[in-house]
A protein has these predicted regions:
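Cofactor-/ligand-binding subdomain signature composed of acidic, glycine-rich
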Residues: 1-4, 260-276
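Short beta->alpha connector loops at strand-helix junctions that form conserved
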Residues: 334-335, 359-360, 418-421, 527-528
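Extended, hydrophobic alpha-helical segments in both membrane/secreted and soluble proteins
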Residues: 108, 112-125, 319, 331, ...
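Short amphipathic alpha-helical interaction patches enriched in hydrophobic/aromatic residues
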Residues: 5-9, 217-220, 412-415
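Thiamine diphosphate
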Residues: 59-91, 101-105, 131-267, 279-326, ...
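Short, well-ordered alpha-helical packing segments
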Residues: 22, 26, 96, 109-113, ...
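Cofactor-binding active-site loop characterized by glycine-rich and histidine/acidic residues
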Residues: 3, 11-132, 306-307, 311-312, ...
Length: 595
């Protein structure tokens, strides 16, 4: 596992912490008849190794290889799709109820981490499932971390349980004493082993004599050493014997067995290629859109006490570690709780603060109702720093940032920026904070700065580059504007005259841009977003409303995008420079009628 992740990148620390647990699960349960649902999928690598994918494990996260998350189309042993957090209990409960309807006595097993318990969805599932009388077993893998250190009262609550001695050790000690007691000892042990009210019921109790899980209707077992196979198998067999919803609480060490990962589990949660001997990544993450965003936000906040930073358990991923280090009182990590993060930000805004919520595009999808109801209708000014906007690469379908634009443009009065380079990112962040009202969004990609186009005329609106004698206009925004600009240069060098338009503020579109575009006979729009509901459709619609008489073409992303490198994906979907040149030439030569 370590060798493969060092070459391919991936989620290492969480998987190393779940090796023994996964082995025990597969020894006690009968997959795929018993359905094992992995929350997020960050812990599923050993599961893949044990379920027929050892010979393909070197392809994990590679193009045409196995996924870094569970994926039912990949294996019958992957009972449910994973990628986003806190979904396992609801999914496993649904599976358990379906089994019950069918008279199927197999088990539904949800494997979740304590980090997922910072997300609200999992409590909806726990609340609904606890008293259901189904064969549902929830395994809580408690390593005191999600991606970074867990936050909130529930993390402290679980830690208080974690610090108690496990019930199995106590149970065995009692059994040993009783077994050595003449005459009556062994019969008592037999009774204890067959009773559903075993020694575990006296090991851990809070003042009200129950755990939160028992209050919700579950039988609670644990905590158990998650690196002791004997203990794990015993507690899982015990859980099976109840035939009722059970929570098994397991303590593990994130990064177990690999010193660099144990020392820095947050850094080894999701890591790029690295040197096994030192643990050092091949490429530094100090220079990327996320860190540029984080440093610029800190710079602004040092001058303005109203600015606050909010993250949903992604402090390092979104570059907010700089803000956190220097302005702790205005930094808020709310856990894996995007809905709460948005409404919490709206609350800050209602009191005159300027909250900036940095969030991955794919995770923002979970909070659309709050953006509409609590931010926009409520007329609260918040700024979204939408990280990983566009293609993200090896994490595949569940993580591509392709749907924020269709979702956000449906919200009245939202303003959206999509800078094409670091300097524009800084400019857009400043404008979103100080010149916008209501919902202001700045979206930026995974990766590094673009270098091809002329940066002497950067702004937060748009840039036209004209030949003054062209009938063809090329349009784009964000990262792939750099690819389009390279195509533009190549075409003009081949005497294919064309003009180019770079949008920086992509929504709402300025009327002047549409008016200026009406003169062209052909307009071709490229975007790194879902073409359905994308800016290219909005742009085309505005042209039609103004009686555009030319031909309009759009090239964006259709369907779900599978894992590969960003470069390979852009080539595959036709959004790299060479593919753009071919597409444009085909339109000019063959008059392809594609919209």
């Amino acid at each position: 596992m370590i060798d493969t992740v060092s070459k391919n990148g991936g989620h290492l620390a969480s998987n190393l912490g779940a090796v023994e647990l996964t082995m025990a699960i597969h020894r006690v349960f009968n997959s795929p008849e018993d359905k094992i649902v992995w929350d997020v999928g960050h812990q599923s690598y050993t599961h893949k190794l044990l379920t027929g994918r050892l010979d393909r494990f070197s392809t994990i996260r590679k193009e045409d290889g196995i996924s870094g998350f569970t994926k039912p189309e990949e294996s019958l042993h992957d009972a449910f799709i994973s990628g986003h957090s806190s979904t396992s209990v609801s999914a496993a409960y649904g599976i358990a109820q379906a089994m019950k309807i069918d008279g199927n006595e197999n088990y539904a097993v949800a494997v979740t981490g304590d980090g997922a318990l910072t997300g609200g969805l999992i409590y909806e599932g726990l609340n609904n499932a606890g008293k259901s009388n189904t064969n549902l077993i929830i395994i809580l893998n408690h390593n005191d971390m999600s991606i970074s250190k867990n936050v909130g009262a529930l993390a402290k609550y679980l830690l208080s349980i974690r610090n108690k001695r496990g019930y199995l050790k106590t149970k065995r000690a009692v059994e040993k004493v009783l077994t050595n007691t003449p005459v009556v000892g062994k019969p008592i042990v037999k009774v204890l082993k067959t009773s559903k009210d075993t020694v575990k019921n006296t090991v851990y109790r809070k003042s009200n004599n129950t755990t939160i899980f028992e209050d919700l209707g579950f039988i609670y077992l644990g905590p158990v050493d998650g690196h002791n196979l004997e203990d794990l198998e015993e507690v899982l067999y015990t859980a099976k014997s109840y035939h009722k919803p059970v929570v098994v609480h397991v303590n593990t060490v994130k990064g177990k067995g690999y010193a660099p990962a144990e020392k820095n589990p947050g850094e080894f949660h999701g890591i790029s290629k690295f040197d096994i001997m030192t643990g050092n990544p091949e490429v530094s993450s100090d220079d990327c859109y996320s860190t540029v965003f984080g440093r610029e936000l800190l710079k602004l906040a040092l001058k303005d006490q109203k600015i606050c930073a909010v993250t949903a358990a992604m402090k390092y991923g979104t570059g907010l570690q700089y803000f956190s280090n220097q302005l702790k009182d205005r930094f808020f990590d709310v856990g894996i709780a995007e809905q709460h993060a948005v409404t919490f930000s709206a609350g800050l805004a209602s009191m005159g603060k300027i909250p900036v919520f940095a969030v991955y595009s794919s995770f923002l999808q979970r909070a659309i109702d709050q953006l509409i109801h609590d931010v926009t209708i409520g007329k609260n000014h918040i700024v979204l720093g939408i990280d990983r906007a566009g293609i993200v690469g090896e994490d595949g379908e569940t993580h591509q940032g392709l749907y924020d634009i269709p979702l956000l443009t449906a919200i009245p009065n939202a303003e959206i920026y999509s800078p094409a380079c670091y300097e524009e990112l800084k400019m857009c962040l400043n404008e979103a904070i100080y010149k916008c009202q209501g919902l202001a969004c700045v979206r930026y990609p995974k990766g590094n700065d673009c270098t091809s186009f002329n940066k002497s005329d950067l702004n937060t609106s748009y840039t036209f580059t004209e030949n003054h004698c062209s009938d063809l206009l090329l349009v784009s925004y964000g990262r792939i504007y750099d690819e389009l600009y390279k195509a533009y240069v190549l075409l003009n060098n081949e005497n294919v005259k064309c003009d180019i338009l770079k949008l920086t503020k992509i929504f709402p579109l300025e009327n002047y841009i549409i008016q200026k575009s009406l003169k062209y006979k052909k307009i071709i729009f490229f975007e790194e977003s879902s073409v359905s509901g994308g800016i290219s459709q909005i742009f085309g619609n505005e042209l039609l409303l103004k009686n555009f008489s030319g031909n309009y073409y759009s090239k964006g992303v259709k369907g779900f995008v599978k894992q590969a490198t960003i470069k390979s994906i852009l080539e595959r979907i036709g959004l790299d420079c060479d593919s753009m040149v071919v597409y444009i030439k085909n339109i000019l030569e063959n008059d392809i009628n594609e919209t």
